[in-house]
Amino acid sequence: MIDTSDVRKMNMNAIRAVMWRGGEHTKQSIAADTGLSVATCNTLLNELERNGEVHGQKYQLNGVGRSTSVYQINEDYESILCVRIDLDSEGNRLLLCDVLSMLRSTLYQEQTQFTILDMDRVAGKITEMLEKFPNISCILVGTSGIIDHGVLRLSDIPELEEAHLLDALRTVAQQRPIYMTYDCQYRVYGAYKDAGYTSETLTLLFCMRNVLAGTASVIGGRIVSGKNGFAGMTGYMPWGMSQEEQIQVIAQGSPKGLELIVKTALSVIAVLNPDELLFAGNVVDREMMEAVQTACAKAVPPEFLPKLRLADHRGDQYYLEGMYQKALEMK
């Protein structure tokens, strides 16, 4: 049962969602966008203004008549820390930190390369970022492995395997909320939001040289994680080769790599029947994409074939977008 405080929080977040679009808004326009009464918007906007989350200013519209209060987000009020733990195709460990405003403006970017990237180094970098930006209100962490109840497993970075990463980061987060998940889940969520989907099913197939290929899916607006984050780990399907062999085969491309990618795509189509299958990473290029489309079209009746699309720029733009969208939901 939803109590009064829950309703109030939902109403507040509905107003925030409008404000996060940027620009200036009146109580009347926010009421129209949210379906809330003008009186409710007035009460909640006054609170947001007192807290410093929004700025309010009185204007005379068209220079005549009574003045009207106009509100916009205060970008200095809070920020979002996005931390990506990554491994490039040469095996270098990367720690990428981005600080975003609630309007998605990039306030700070940093990339650090490591020979060894363990839990202490990740925690140390987050501590450093919190000292530099004390208005950080939430922390998003993306990993190159699944998060099983706070423990990093199947990590592409060996020294982070079985790391109790969530507990370690909560220690340094100083009460700030943390959301942590497999990198591909952020990518697919960012792509889903970018496409404007709400009820559709989108699957991302991520193929990167020197790491195990995998998938991530969003169904009806919800990320599919499974019992402990293993959902989408197609590299553990019985392809007749080890995970190490799969990595080598996919890195080589055609013909064996293409065959494995097609099998993976067909398994996703058969199990999830998605509206769209998005290919990302640095293995599938436009030529290979055409071959994948041809092979899938031969195997699947046209009425069941999803839209097959190759992401621009390896799909990297969706990673940060997925983190930003998750941060908005954490309010």
Predicted regions and their residues:
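Short, acidic Gly/Pro/Ser/Thr-rich loop/turn segments
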Residues: 88-90, 146-148, 212-214
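ATP-binding/phosphotransfer module of carbohydrate and carboxylate kinases, centering on a glycine-rich
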Residues: 1-57, 62-66, 70-107, 114-128, ...
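Glycine-rich phosphate-binding loop and adjoining helix at the ATP-binding site
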Residues: 107-194, 200, 288-299
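Short glycine-aspartate micro-motif
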Residues: 80-86, 138-140, 201-206, 214
